A protein has these predicted regions:
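Residues at the starts of beta-strands that form the adenosine-phosphate
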Residues: 35-38, 88, 140, 179
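Conserved P-loop
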Residues: 2, 6, 10-84
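Residue-level signal for inorganic ion chemistry
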Residues: 24, 59, 91, 146, ...
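Structural motif
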Residues: 11, 89-91, 142-144
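Conserved inter-motif catalytic segment of the P-loop NTP-binding fold
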Residues: 48-129
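Short loop/turn elements that form and flank the Walker-type P-loop nucleotide-binding site
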Residues: 5-6, 85-86, 93, 136-138
């Protein structure tokens, strides 16, 4: 199966530990574009969480040494800026953690802020900006995201809101993408 990113914009979806990140990394590593990849790490750092730090270190160690890592987790606006300024291929991993940071930044977990409309407006600005940056990217971009819609309905409003917002974000990225893949149990399936 040809997995070369001939397309400029690629979205790779999958569940937790589905192999989606490995597939994205392989896709870019095997690309005909030999320029170094910028790896946009959207995960925030959690001081004192040794297991999380170990995960980050493991991911970093398995990427090619020529790749440049840019951590965007502390600032949800940084991913859109990086996509607009890119001068080579970008791997954005992952939109799920990006959305977590964005929702943190706009108090989207707070029921009163959400009900008053402040949080949805502010979140809309952030999601609109990152989606526009992806849609108009001048360089190849491979974006990775979780597909949460296959699971159970979350029991609390904040978790349901997150699932719904991620579903909308994934739909926006899929509409703008040239190629969309779903990875299940390490097996990639081209959707678009």
């Amino acid at each position: 199966m040809d997995t070369q990113p001939a397309a400029r914009r690629v979205l790779i979806l999958g569940g937790a530990r589905s192999g989606k990140s490995s597939f994205a990394e392989r896709m870019l590593a095997e690309s005909a574009d030999t320029r170094p990849v910028t790896y946009a790490a959207t995960a925030p750092r959690y001081p004192g969480d040794a297991e999380w730090a170990e995960r980050i270190a493991k991911h970093r160690a398995q990427r090619p040494s020529a790749w440049r890592t840019v951590e965007t987790g502390a600032d949800p606006g940084a991913l859109a800026e990086l996509l607009r300024a890119a001068d080579g291929p970008v791997l954005a991993d992952c939109l799920t953690l990006w959305l977590t940071s964005a929702m943190d930044a706009v108090d989207a977990w707070d029921e009163a802020a959400w009900a008053a409309g402040r949080a949805p407006r502010r979140l809309g600005v952030l999601t609109g900006s990152v989606l526009a940056a992806f849609a108009h990217a001048r360089e190849p971009v491979v974006a990775v995201s979780n597909e949460l819609g296959f699971g159970l309905v979350p029991p609390d409003p904040g978790s349901r809101r997150f699932r719904d917002e991620l579903g909308r974000l994934n739909q926006g990225f899929a509409a703008a993408a040239d190629d969309v893949w779903l990875v299940v149990a390490g097996l990639p399936l081209r959707l678009k």
